[in-house]
Design a protein with these regions (language model features):
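N-terminal signal-anchor transmembrane alpha helix of single-pass membrane proteins
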Residues: 1-27
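Hydrophobic/aromatic packing residues within the alpha-helices of TPR/SEL1-like helical repeat arrays
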Residues: 45-46, 79, 116, 150
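Short coil turns that delineate tetratricopeptide repeat
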Residues: 53-54, 87-90, 124, 158, ...
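TPR alpha-solenoid repeat register
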Residues: 58, 92-95, 129, 162-164, ...
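Cys/His-clustered metal-coordination modules, chiefly Zn-binding fingers
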Residues: 216-319
Length: 319
């Protein structure tokens, strides 16, 4: 009797496993078919990769090569094929994660969110998937959802104090709240994310407010571009070198670029400053200031680089 029961349990367990695998395969096929029409990989190459005896791990590696070279459409197509060939949950989880990153890099934000959620279904504590899911919500300005993800990361012991401060400040900045109340609330997050002070300076300038009413003033290194291009003068010893370079006082200058600018003006050379912006982590260079690097997603990594140029000219002055 006992043997019969054990045999029945074993048989049921076997068929349950078969049905479960079939359900998973149908789910994967349905997911892949949803995105398949947008693939940019030639159909003959897709068919070849499907037919050949190439495992999901090898396809995942191949897709990664295309992703690293910026060919995201090809990478996405191969990840989708790899997903169909994945046999284990861990394989599927990894491919979902990499596929989501490719969609995110390619600018398909909503799709990336859907894919990261699939990875999280398999492993709810996947820190990498949660982090990138939060980035997707941030790009779509879904600040509340982004904060929910950050809370989940914090519960796992991840230090996200800076990200939480930035997200809450960003939510306030984009809100319709009354100006003084908005600024006061934003200032509370400056200790956890120091560039909140730059965000507040931007708000003052955009709204035509007196910038000397700011309680928490940003470091000059974090706002050199804004102050140089703005006519208003921000009080404080830290800023005197900048205004000396602009000819508005006689403070001695230590900063090399500012000293060059002042020397050029004293010698009647038509000179001004332009600015480029470099990520101190990945060294990516951008034409505009950023709070989060678009390439490596590092928060607060922007370094402002002043360049001396001929006024009304893009050509740098060499000395």
């Amino acid at each position: 009797m006992l043997f019969s029961v054990l045999l029945l349990v074993a048989i049921l367990s076997y068929f349950w496993g078969v049905f479960s695998l079939n359900d998973q395969k149908k789910s994967i096929d349905k997911f892949v078919n949803k995105f398949q029409p947008q693939n940019q990989l030639d159909q003959k190459y897709q068919d070849m990769l499907i037919r050949l005896d190439i495992d999901s791990g090898s396809l995942n590696a191949l897709a990664g090569i295309f992703a690293r070279s910026g060919e995201f459409n090809k990478a996405i197509a191969i990840y989708l094929i790899a997903l169909q060939k994945a046999l284990t949950k861990s394989q599927k989880e990894l491919i979902f994660l990499n596929l989501g990153k490719a969609y995110l890099k390619a600018g398909f934000i909503q799709r990336s969110i859907e894919v990261f959620l699939e990875a999280i279904k398999i492993s709810p504590k996947n820190i990498d998937a949660l982090s990138h899911l939060g980035l997707g919500f941030e790009k779509l300005r879904l600040h509340d959802k982004s904060l929910e993800v950050l809370d989940a990361l914090q519960e796992q012991g991840v230090d996200v104090a800076q990200e939480i401060a930035y997200t809450k400040a960003l939510k306030l900045k984009n809100s319709q709240m009354e100006f003084d109340q908005k600024v006061a609330k934003m200032a509370k997050f400056a200790n956890d994310f120091k560039l909140v002070s730059r965000m507040i300076l931007e708000l003052f300038i955009i709204n035509g407010k007196d910038i000397n009413l700011i309680n928490i003033k940003p470091d000059l290194a974090d706002c050199l571009d804004i102050l140089y291009l703005n006519d208003a003068i921000l009080d404080g010893d830290e800023y005197k070198e900048l205004y000396s370079a602009k000819g508005q006082n006689q403070t001695p200058i230590n900063n090399f670029e500012l000293k060059l600018l002042k020397t050029a003006k004293q010698n009647k050379i038509n000179a001004t400053l332009s600015f480029s912006y470099v990520c101190n982590k990945c060294k990516g260079t951008y034409p505009l200031f950023f709070y989060r690097c678009n390439h490596c997603a590092r928060l607060g990594s922007c370094v402002i680089i002043p360049n001396l140029i001929k006024e009304n000219d893009e050509e740098c002055i060499s000395f």
